[in-house]
Amino acid sequence: MIGGGIDLTREDGRMFNELRPVKITTDFVKFAEGSCLIQCGDTMVLCCASVEEKTPPHVPYGEGWITAEYSMLPRANRERSRRDVAKLKLSPRSAEIQRLVGRSLRSAVDMKRLGERTITIDCDVLQGDGGTRTASVTGVSAGIVEDAPLLDLRYSEDSRAQVDLNCVMNELGELIEIQGTGEGRAFSPAEQQELVRLCAKGCKELLSIQKEALGGKF
């Protein structure tokens, strides 16, 4: 039964509604206008921001733009994967994730206050153990594994998930992005609500970690 009374200890010792240890290291690289390394358990993503004093043609006069690129290092996973550039095309997964990151960030920024400039966020996965797309934008995943709802799936859980859901939320707890998929079975509206509730808890905790990492700058 899905509900708040579940007492489930997972293979890594976490409770069903517990995030993996999260660490955000700011100014991780020297030359980018902004950067951070985010670690969610064994998942590590390097995010770098680059600023250009111009915007794409479709952007309204006086406004800015935020876009993103996403990739995984060949040995970010247990087996080597080919770089997208070696395949001469962007993988559908990478394209989907970088659109997710761009959309999410644009929803959080006042484009008029940004001015006529473009910020490009490069998200490079150094090591992947589940949740690389949500780590790239400080969102969180939840899923149903063996009919139990779990927050923040690592790879060994994600690979067995019957239902997988990714959420990005703002400071008010409002949804910016939600992606839910039945991997092994269908899921009910009540189950979806429970997974969103778990994600809301996780996003609230991640927001506090972000603010602490920024040292009160924002």
Residue ranges, per PLM feature:
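A structural signal for small-residue-enriched, beta-sheet-centric alpha/beta enzyme cores
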Residues: 92, 113-116, 131-135, 141-218
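Glycine-rich, flexible beta-strand/loop modules in the N-terminal catalytic cores of phosphate-handling
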Residues: 28, 33-114, 175, 179-182, ...
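Compositionally biased, non-globular sequence tracts
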Residues: 7-10, 14, 85-86, 146, ...
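Glycine-rich, charged/polar anion/phosphate-binding loops
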Residues: 22-25, 31-34, 52-54, 107, ...
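Glycine- and acidic-rich phosphate- and metal-coordinating loops
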Residues: 102, 112-128
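A short glycine/serine-rich beta->alpha loop
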Residues: 86-90, 123-132
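Short, Gly/Pro- and small/polar-rich lid/capping loops
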Residues: 2-39
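Generic beta-strand or strand-like secondary-structure segments
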Residues: 96, 100-104, 120, 139, ...
